[in-house]
Amino acid sequence: MNKIIIFISIFFFISCTNSPKTKTGSEELDDTTNTKLDRAFTSFRIGEAQYLSEKRFTELLDLFDKYKGVTDEITFFTHTTHAPLTLDDFRQRVDVLKLRMEEVRNRGYRTGINILTTIGHHNENLDNSLKGDYTNMTGIEGDVSHGSYCPNNKNLQEYIRQLYQMTTEANPDYIWIDDDVRLGHMPIGYGCFCDNCLKIFEKETGARYSREGLNKAMNEGTVDEKLKLRKEWLQHNRNTIARLFVLIEETVHKINPDMPLGFMTGDRFFEGYDFGNWAKILAGPNNAPVMWRPGGGFYNDVNTSGLAGKSHDIGRQVSVLPKAIVSVQSEIECFPYQRLKKAANIVVLEASSHIAAGCTGAAFNVLSMYDEPLDEYEPLIARLHESRQFFDLMVKSLGRSALTGVNTLWNKDSYITGNLNNGNWVSAGNPVIGHDIYNIGLPACYSNQHAEVTILGKDNIYAFSKEEIKEILSRGVYMDAETLQYLNKMGFGEFTGFEVVKSENVDRIEKFSTHPLNGNFAGRERDNRQSFWKSSAYTLRKTNENTQVLSGLIDYTGTKVSDCTMGVFENKLGGRICVAGYYPWSFMENLSKSSQMKSVFRWLSKDSLPAYIASFHKMNLWVREPQDGKIALAFTNSSFDPAKDVTLMLQTENTKIKVYDMNCKETIIQSSGENGLYQKFIIPEVDPWQMRLVIL
């Protein structure tokens, strides 16, 4: 990447009472628009217990007024439970909301409706939910979810049409479609495999299947046969959601052509991850604004590593959105809303972390679902109010610019590779490899287009064409031994530099060789106890004289049992390759291994990594591509210990950076020297679970 042009950003505080001075959605749904944002998009999602009662509703608005600026938007859920409402019950809610929204506008907020169930989430409150001649969401084994319905059912489509017609006629400022519009539903797992869906698939492909026959064909046969059928089913899933969105868009925009529509998502691999196309459909012929709410898990702070994990999930989702979608509000979820389940500081950090990963704001679903006073929630509201200026500064500085750094390879077809050699495809799970590499200070990226180094894992390589694979191998690549075997089998051996000789499942320890990338850690050992954490240790053999060994294997007597388990190679395409055969995805958190990995990834990138944390700290880092001659990045101390003397290596000629803490306190830091293309900046201290924003 090009060297970063010197730029000193001047921040000025903008009153929190005004809405962002941009459209709420899309100007043109393409990848060229880069709308300037001056503050974050923030909203609160409000349950029916807080708006059906006049007393509770007034108290809610008074609380928001007390902390004016904590939110710009107040969004109302249509109901509380997760199966679809009857039309009569839905109309009663909407009639109340029409009045409530007028009161909200009178207080100076934008307001809209979040339709909790379009097709339904799962089995809950079934006795008081929608019943009738509708087809339930059906699993591959023929089991059904009684709380969710097939969106291809004609009767359900008429129900949905009336649902969105009533909602639009209530005159909200916007409408949100919730994440029940997906194809994974409890208790069946993935659907829909009802008889009607099989008939639609037959029309799409010309192939007729029973459920049993389809399941067998998806899991048996040659690799190419399975990949072809699975890819066709993913397209069928994309089409199913596209048809639903055509119905919603036409219903809404027939009444109000300019009505903004928003959609909430998670990782949608089985659905085909067709966000760009779905967004264009929702915009309609008049190109109405489209909003997005990427989400995932992390409902409490019991497992704090889930915070960054959710940011990575969200970053993937944002990476495929058209740039013209500017209102990208992360889902901040504290379900079931028990205040001690997630600390206020963690809620603030979560919103900040998701902004760092690509969002432009946050939608807070954090308040009570009971008809009770909000006294226990006021400290959380106050803490979010204090943090609003930091959210604004982050969005102003980062905008919708692309992340650059290390990408874990995936694409819209990645789900076709799950359980490719054995097992049930439909239950394969997330196709993207999970790893610790992003926790040691390497910059996370979610797009192959903007990656400086690419991580290959699982069977994901089968989702790419041979031309795409060759292009990937012409750049920096880190892979495990299983991927090496796949690539060599596919005919790419001349570009990988190694082959697998054998694997062993017990009593193997990695030992670092003498090599410049290992620095002073030659001879260090890494024992990840295969008897506890099961993972094969692979022995690699060089297939090219230019390969270099970074580590071998020893046993518990110290005897060498493998000359090479990790090595590097530069191929004739100019690509730099690292193959890791010993715990390639985990146990990176000691000094020697984390230092080695940073050296390796810098080497793989040919010094094109935009930044990394060189010091020994548990850090998550996000760096944006330069925009208008400036760069911005954010990092989190993802530890319960203070991080002292954090060393940020930044590819720039600038010798001065501005560092902002989460109270927007600015510190100017001078470079402590340079290393090649990188300047070295030392941040004195970062408290536990705190973020820093860096601007230059």
Language model features: what each stretch is:
Residues 43-59, 145-159, 334-344:
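Active-site mouth loops of central-metabolism enzymes
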Residues 28, 48-51, 67, 72, ...:
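Hydrophobic targeting/anchoring helices
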Residues 4-13:
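Sec-dependent N-terminal signal peptides
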Residues 110-170, 179, 187, 205-236:
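Active-site-adjacent "subsite" loops/lids of carbohydrate-active enzymes
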Residues 32-96:
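N-terminal substrate-binding region of glycoside hydrolase catalytic domains
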Residues 425-429, 435, 444-446, 455-696:
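A conserved amphipathic helix/loop scaffold
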Residues 61-64, 78-132, 248:
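Aromatic-lined substrate-binding rim segments of carbohydrate-active enzymes
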